[in-house]
From Swiss-Prot:
Keywords: Isopeptide bond, Ubl conjugation pathway. This is Prokaryotic ubiquitin-like protein UBact. NCBIfam families: ubiq_like_UBact (NF033388). InterPro entries: UBact. There is a cross-link at Q56 (Isoglutamyl lysine isopeptide (Gln-Lys) (interchain with K-? in acceptor proteins)). Residues 1-56 are annotated as: Disordered. GO terms for molecular function: protein tag activity. May be modified by deamidation of its C-terminal glutamine to glutamate by the adjacently encoded deamidase. This could be a prerequisite to the subsequent conjugation, as shown in the other prokaryotic ubiquitin-like protein Pup. Residues 26-48 have a biased composition (Basic and acidic residues). The gene is ubact. The modification Deamidated glutamine is found at Q56. The keyword Cell membrane does not apply. It holds the Pfam family UBact.
Protein backbone atom coordinates (compact mmCIF):
# COMPACT_ATOMS: atom_id res chain seq x y z
CA UNK A 1 0.00 0.00 0.00
CA UNK A 2 1.37 3.44 -0.85
CA UNK A 3 1.89 5.95 1.92
CA UNK A 4 -0.56 8.84 1.95
CA UNK A 5 1.09 12.19 1.43
CA UNK A 6 0.00 14.84 3.90
CA UNK A 7 -0.75 18.27 2.55
CA UNK A 8 0.55 21.15 4.60
CA UNK A 9 -1.63 24.20 5.10
CA UNK A 10 -0.31 27.67 5.82
CA UNK A 11 -0.82 28.52 9.48
CA UNK A 12 -1.04 32.30 9.27
CA UNK A 13 -2.29 34.74 6.67
CA UNK A 14 -0.78 34.56 3.24
CA UNK A 15 2.01 36.78 1.95
CA UNK A 16 -0.54 39.22 0.53
CA UNK A 17 -1.14 40.69 3.99
CA UNK A 18 -4.40 38.95 4.81
CA UNK A 19 -6.36 42.19 5.15
CA UNK A 20 -8.96 41.34 2.54
CA UNK A 21 -11.66 39.81 4.74
CA UNK A 22 -14.25 41.67 6.77
CA UNK A 23 -13.19 42.80 10.21
CA UNK A 24 -15.19 42.73 13.39
CA UNK A 25 -17.28 45.85 13.94
CA UNK A 26 -16.29 48.26 16.67
CA UNK A 27 -19.31 48.06 18.96
CA UNK A 28 -19.44 49.42 22.49
CA UNK A 29 -20.57 47.13 25.27
CA UNK A 30 -24.00 47.96 26.64
CA UNK A 31 -24.20 49.58 30.05
CA UNK A 32 -25.09 46.59 32.23
CA UNK A 33 -26.23 48.72 35.16
CA UNK A 34 -28.81 50.46 33.00
CA UNK A 35 -29.89 47.13 31.54
CA UNK A 36 -30.33 45.55 34.98
CA UNK A 37 -32.28 48.58 36.19
CA UNK A 38 -34.70 48.26 33.26
CA UNK A 39 -35.00 44.51 33.78
CA UNK A 40 -35.88 45.00 37.45
CA UNK A 41 -38.81 47.16 36.44
CA UNK A 42 -40.16 44.45 34.14
CA UNK A 43 -39.40 41.27 36.11
CA UNK A 44 -37.22 41.28 39.26
CA UNK A 45 -36.63 37.52 39.08
CA UNK A 46 -35.39 37.78 35.51
CA UNK A 47 -32.88 40.43 36.57
CA UNK A 48 -31.62 38.09 39.30
CA UNK A 49 -31.23 35.20 36.84
CA UNK A 50 -29.40 37.46 34.40
CA UNK A 51 -26.94 38.55 37.09
CA UNK A 52 -26.26 34.92 37.97
CA UNK A 53 -25.80 33.96 34.32
CA UNK A 54 -23.39 36.78 33.52
CA UNK A 55 -21.49 36.57 36.80
CA UNK A 56 -22.38 40.04 38.04
Amino acid sequence: MPDQAQKTRPVGPGPSGGGEGPGSPKVEKPNTEELLKRMRKVDPDQAKRYRQRTGQ
